[in-house]
Design a protein with these regions (language model features):
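Aromatic-lined, polymer-binding surfaces characteristic
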Residues: 1-186, 196
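Carbohydrate-active enzyme catalytic cores, enriched for enzymes
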Residues: 111, 153-262
Length: 262
């Protein structure tokens, strides 16, 4: 996370110190990644205990690579690709050959690496491959927009994977290729409203840390750039972060009253 912030600050300020630190971190991981043993026998994860955590952090490495693209020489970026990003992609592609929330995260992470390094074949495999993003969404989301693994918390979790991918695809001018999948993801964030109890709490049928509530203003605010909602925009206008600096949220639409309520 700090590496991403340093890369962002370099883009914002042009200060070489931020560039040197972020690029130095990428150099370190590239130089050592293949020297580190996998965390567990028979599992390819090297930086973390499981490939899910590798995936959720790989998107940060990909973002740093994108942010520094115009400031780092091509040979250095190629070393990052060859010695860090591509080995991570191979590790993620070797597991989770199924429709699953972890598989979706892993394919989304690989797709973001593909965008960062300009690898069309990698992109096509992550999106349209046998266990790619399209199949994950087509088979993993029910007709009433719930993730099939029966945890309501997974709705937001897989939507966050697609939010990360949608943001990267939008920056690369390729969000239109994912228009259906992103629309489904937005509905994943909204569908729990249909199941909430009168006090806003949600049922907890499966894997969850505790009783959640709907709507979740924080999640909707984080998602406004790709999944704009009235409540999300209302929350986002009060936030000061990288997203709202680059893409200030518009005023939310007014919610008019129906004639019967007047």
């Amino acid at each position: 996370e700090t590496m991403v912030r340093a890369a962002q600050l370099h883009r914002l300020t042009g200060e070489a110190a931020f560039l040197d630190w972020a690029a130095g971190q990428m150099d370190f991981y590239a130089a050592n990644f293949l020297l580190w043993e996998p965390q567990r026998p028979g599992h390819p994860a090297r930086l973390f205990w499981q490939t899910l955590t590798e995936a959720t952090n790989l998107v940060k490495f990909a973002d740093v690579c994108r942010l520094l693209a115009g400031a780092v020489e091509a040979e250095r970026r190629e070393r990052w690709r060859r010695e860090l990003l591509e080995p991570e992609v191979r590790a993620l592609n070797s597991t989770q050959q199924q429709v699953h929330n972890i598989a979706l995260w892993q394919r989304c992470a690989v797709a973001q690496v593909a965008l960062a390094v300009g690898d069309e074949a990698m992109w096509r495999g992550a999106i349209d491959g046998p266990w790619g993003v399209r199949r994950q969404v087509a088979e993993g989301v029910t007709s009433d927009y719930f993730w099939y693994e029966q945890s309501l918390g997974y709705n937001a979790y897989v939507a966050q994977a697609l939010l990360s991918l949608g943001t990267a695809a939008g920056l690369a001018g390729r969000a239109d290729e994912l228009s259906h999948e992103l629309a489904v993801a937005q509905n994943l964030l909204l569908s729990p409203l249909l199941l909430r109890f009168p006090d806003g709490r949600l049922p907890n049928p499966a894997d969850s840390r505790g009783a959640a509530r709907a709507p979740d203003p924080e999640v909707l605010a984080r998602s406004y750039r790709v999944f704009p909602t009235t409540l999300g925009l209302e929350e986002a206008v009060r936030v000061r972060d990288w997203n709202t600096l680059l893409d200030p949220p518009p005023a939310p639409p007014r919610v008019g009253r129906s004639p019967r309520s007047r």
